[in-house]
Amino acid sequence: STLMRSSAASDVYKRQKKYNTNCTFHVNPFDAYMDSPMWDMYVKKDLLCRNADGSLVKGDVWWNRQSYFVNMVNEWNAGVTKQRIDAFIEQVPLVKETGVLYFDNETQYPPSLYHYVTKEDQISAIKKAAEYLKTEYGIQLIGEYADTNLYGVCSLGVTWDWWASLNINQMEVAPYIACGGRDGTHDELYGGQIDLTKRRFQVFGASVQLEDTQFQRDPFKVARELSHHTYVYFYLNRLLRLKYETRDTLGITLTLSDNVVSKWDNDNVHRLYRDGYLMKEGHDVFVPVFWVNHLEIMAYSVKGRTGIWHFPREWTGIEKVDIYTFNEDFTGLRLLEQGRKINKNQIYLSQEPDRAQIIVPAGTDMTDRSTIYSNPPSGTATFICKDVETHGNWKRKYGKKGYDIFGHSSKLPKTCMLSYIGDSLKVLDNNSTRPVSLQKVEGKGRIEAVRTSVLHQLIDVTVEENTKVSLYFADYKEKNCQEVVDVIDVNTKRMLASYLLNNFEEGVYLSFGVSGNVQFRITRFFYDHYGNPDYPVCSAIFFDKE
């Protein structure tokens, strides 16, 4: 159901470009209402949840209308789910441009006792709908709540209360699989009290809830929330999480890649540092806007601030900057100062309360709306095959152009560059005799070693055109390792290929056709209701002609 006409939705999508943004569309496939034109069909085909006595299962009353629950299993089996998806995409084709569809209130799938349909059956039907969206239209399902049963099926990158509903340790879930924002109950800027039990929201990055009546009449609040929460949330959740520590009563320290540290100090203030320089203190921020195709800083202070901010290392050598703010109706920028000199990669700023300042190198064309996603790709990658037959006996099949057998020997092609980010090397057995263990380069010995991390790690590879790159994975300790292997374009951050791995106690090779510079991202992943697998592992990388 939806309260927006298709014509209105299309108008919103057309206007989004004016504001340099993309809109997502929210639908609720779980609720049914008697005033819907589809009501009679759903009753006739028996597509609604029923109690054991045959009566309809009621939901809440929304906008003075009684809701009822859709039997997702019967709907799918009747072919109606696909029909609804097809009709919706035809009605609002611009959803394909955004690439995501948001299921509202994704917790409402009760059992239908009359039909002997369990809640687990309902969840399976949702997974089928998600798979259909992905395979048929290339659209990723996203959702309002984090449900462990849908982990990995429904992407949760914008889930506003993901920590509360998933109730897990953030160090166990990568931000590109699940992260999110907050509600208004723990932030004094919403008029509420800070809930110290939720301070991790800001340490890990919390976005903004733009629902209901919070901001509808005051766009300045939107600018405020985006500046000191969403920009930081976006910045933090593109980094690798390396270490999480607590201390004393309030202290939290999160160490991330790129020499970034996010801290909640004992003075009850959140601070963010990169290379030891302050980027955020409370509600004052000086953070990079990294998705645009030029250097840019967003500076903002809720109550006003005067002092020195240090530019990121990428700004070294820049001598002058231009400073902008938003115009009155937030449709563009207004120049505040042109050609301000800076010294020693730092700037003295006098920040007015509640006014964003956008700082760029002098002469930057601010009408250029290109982003990093419009950059030329750094490389290409396609999945070739999965090999579960070779085990550790790689010599006759892999590594003709080069290899790196972790903890043992490395011989790289002359044109290859290889580096590892966010992991550590562990040699488990240097004298193994098991077939799953990798053969040593010389002799008959075998080795069991892995590069591993608590959550995720990167292998950065640059190769010449048409190179076959194969990674070897083995769950040597048989600890239920489950991981997802993504291949990422370094320039645009787009995903080029992806593969889910589990049950690889006997060893498995994943081979990809690669050209240029790509990153293999290996992430701890969960199947079967958050089954607590062991840490991600990788044991070798091989190079051959494609």
Predicted regions: what they are:
Residues 375-546:
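Compositionally biased, intrinsically disordered or flexible polar/acidic segments
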Residues 1, 34-38, 432:
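Short acidic-hydrophobic catalytic motif
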Residues 21, 26-32, 38, 105-110, ...:
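An acidic- and aromatic-residue-enriched active-site/binding cleft used to recognize and process polar
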Residues 14-20, 93:
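Acidic (Asp/Glu)-rich catalytic clusters
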Residues 29-91:
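Active-site-adjacent "subsite" loops/lids of carbohydrate-active enzymes
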Residues 2-9, 13:
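Single conserved hydrophobic/aromatic residue that forms the stacking wall/gate
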Residues 16, 23, 140-141:
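Hydrophobic beta-strand scaffold residues
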Residues 73-99, 105-374:
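Active-site-proximal substrate-binding groove within the catalytic cores of carbohydrate-active enzymes
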